[in-house]
Amino acid sequence: MSFEKERAEAIALVEEALEDFDIDATRAEINSFVDAYTADTINDLELVDIAEAYRNFTDDE
């Protein structure tokens, strides 16, 4: 899978996870999270794990 396609898939998963768990985030925050955690890592996670990782990511900032 190309980098762009993998990244787009990760962004879509993050958006879905955040929506499912009522977490607000801007596009810039989502992009920063995907860059930090890497798309291939995010694409291997369940939505609940993505939401938890995002919460931890924003708590660290």
What do these predicted regions represent?
Residues 1-27:
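N-terminal acidic leader/helix
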